[in-house]
Amino acid sequence: VGLWNYSSPLSATATVGYRPNVAYGEADNVAQAVGLFGTGGVPQTRSAVVAALGNASDQVAESGKDARVVLVTTGTQQDMDDAAFTEAVKNARGEGVSLSVVHLGTGEKDAELEKLADSYSTVSDPSDATANKKSITAAAGAQ
């Protein structure tokens, strides 16, 4: 399991709204690191998911081991329509790659993302640290 963040503001040095934070390794590392993130920026969820699935597919090809993309989101600012997103996910997602989504808060959910995910859970109150940890830990496959 690896961890990226997204919704990063774009600048001269940040040309995409996402970046890796935790290299592939134990799921517990993801569960711990995600607790350090804040919220903000524009949630470029769809482009970030496509990039992460492509990266996970590369990881599977290199390692021969399955990979899981865990998305923790508060919502989606659509940067591609449903048909383009579905096609991009299909093209980026290789064999052995799973997608787990945890939606935090009461913001509008991305119905297309929910359809494409292998697992999808919601934590209504993002200030509930116990519920957050439980959902994210389960999504990451940590024990």
Language model features by range: what are they?
Residues 17-19, 33-42, 74-79, 100, ...:
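Second-shell loop/turn segments in exported
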Residues 54-65, 79-81, 90-91:
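Surface-exposed acidic, glycine-flexible loop patches that form ligand/cofactor-binding
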Residues 55-59, 135-142:
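C-terminal alpha-helix
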Residues 75-127, 131-139:
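VWA/integrin I-like adhesion module and closely mimicked acidic/polar interface patches used
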Residues 41-49:
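Phosphate/oxyanion-binding active-site loops and adjacent basic polyanion-contact surfaces
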Residues 1-3, 22-26, 82, 86:
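…and closely analogous acidic/polar surface helices at protein-protein or active-site interfaces
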Residues 26-33:
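Short, basic/glycine-rich phosphate-binding loops at helix/coil junctions
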Residues 1-22, 49-52, 68-72, 101-108:
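Von Willebrand factor
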